[in-house]
């Protein structure tokens, strides 16, 4: 405001009081300045890149893309997530500051897409790795749909309580803090060998001997069925 506006404010509303809570003030500041970490692996990310141009101008929402997860509070996953990339994605998510949010963009991120039927290395939904706040279906989604997803996330932020969200994220985890897979019931269909998915150690530490042994034990008949 300039000096004239301050003078007018004092003359017309001398007894005005703004009443709010610290939680509402925190929500308002966060929804107005979301800093996303862009995690794009395939064609869906190209649609998000269209938002940077002047036609859509996503800067008006306060979005400032960051290259470091420690400076971001929103991660936008777009594209296929493989089993080899899963620990890296979880590590990026855990390095983000609390509270943090996730938008799953595209069919490949949400369900595995066309790769989920006969691929042994595709994660069938990123929500098996990290909690998702907004699902954005499409192959690929249009830039207008991305803006709508961001708007829905802003509405969700405005109604939440920060402490409850942090506790919920810590309780509902698919991975442990040291990035090891939990033993869960298989969500994959088919009769092929899935022993490679459940490991007792880090997922990145797979010996080549074990990999090729598991790969050779799968017959073409089992893959077809």
Curated annotation (Swiss-Prot):
One MF term in the entry's GO annotations: iron ion binding
Q: Sorted alphabetically, which keywords does the UniProt record give?
A: 4Fe-4S, Chloroplast, Iron, Iron-sulfur, Membrane, Metal-binding, NAD, NADP, Plastid, Plastoquinone, Quinone, Thylakoid, Translocase, Transport
Gene Ontology biological process terms in this record: aerobic respiration; electron transport coupled proton transport; photosynthesis, light reaction
Q: How is the cofactor bound?
A: Binds 1 [4Fe-4S] cluster.
User: Its Enzyme Commission number?
Assistant: 7.1.1.-
Q: Name one GO cellular component term.
A: chloroplast thylakoid membrane
List locations, semicolon-separated. Answer: Plastid, Chloroplast thylakoid membrane
What is the top EC class of this enzyme, as a single word?
translocase
Predominantly, its location class is plastid
Where is [4Fe-4S] cluster bound in this sequence? 43-44, 108, 139
Classify the protein's membrane topology as the record does. Peripheral membrane protein
Catalyzed reactions per annotation: a plastoquinone + NADH + (n+1) H(+)(in) = a plastoquinol + NAD(+) + n H(+)(out); a plastoquinone + NADPH + (n+1) H(+)(in) = a plastoquinol + NADP(+) + n H(+)(out)
PANTHER family, alphabetized: NADH DEHYDROGENASE, NADH DEHYDROGENASE [UBIQUINONE] IRON-SULFUR PROTEIN 7, MITOCHONDRIAL
Task: Spell out the family assignment given in the record's similarity comment.
Answer: Belongs to the complex I 20 kDa subunit family.
Role of this protein = NDH shuttles electrons from NAD(P)H:plastoquinone, via FMN and iron-sulfur (Fe-S) centers, to quinones in the photosynthetic chain and possibly in a chloroplast respiratory chain. The immediate electron acceptor for the enzyme in this species is believed to be plastoquinone. Couples the redox reaction to proton translocation, and thus conserves the redox energy in a proton gradient.
The molecule here is called NAD(P)H-quinone oxidoreductase subunit K, chloroplastic
Q: What is the lineage of its organism?
A: Eukaryota, Viridiplantae, Streptophyta, Embryophyta, Tracheophyta
């Amino acid at each position: 405001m300039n000096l004239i506006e301050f003078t007018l404010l004092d003359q017309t509303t001398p007894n005005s009081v703004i009443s709010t809570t610290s939680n509402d003030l925190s929500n308002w500041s966060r929804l107005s300045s979301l800093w996303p970490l862009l995690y794009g692996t395939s064609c869906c990310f190209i649609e998000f890149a269209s938002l940077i141009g002047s036609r859509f101008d996503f800067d008006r929402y306060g979005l400032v893309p960051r290259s470091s997860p420690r400076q971001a509070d929103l991660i936008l996953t777009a594209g296929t997530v493989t089993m080899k990339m899963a620990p890296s994605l979880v590590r990026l998510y855990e390095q983000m500051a609390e509270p943090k949010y996730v938008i799953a963009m595209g069919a490949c991120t949400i369900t595995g897409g066309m790769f989920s039927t006969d691929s042994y290395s595709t994660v069938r939904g990123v929500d098996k790795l990290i909690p998702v706040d907004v699902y954005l279906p499409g192959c690929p989604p249009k830039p207008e749909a991305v803006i709508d997803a961001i708007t829905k996330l802003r509405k969700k932020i405005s109604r939440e309580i920060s402490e409850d969200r942090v506790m919920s994220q810590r309780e509902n985890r698919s991975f442990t803090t040291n990035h090891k897979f939990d033993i869960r019931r298989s969500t994959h269909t088919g009769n092929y060998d899935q022993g490679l998915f459940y490991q007792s150690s880090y997922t990145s530490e797979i010996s080549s001997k074990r990999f090729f042994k598991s790969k050779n034990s799968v017959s073409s008949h089992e893959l077809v069925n």
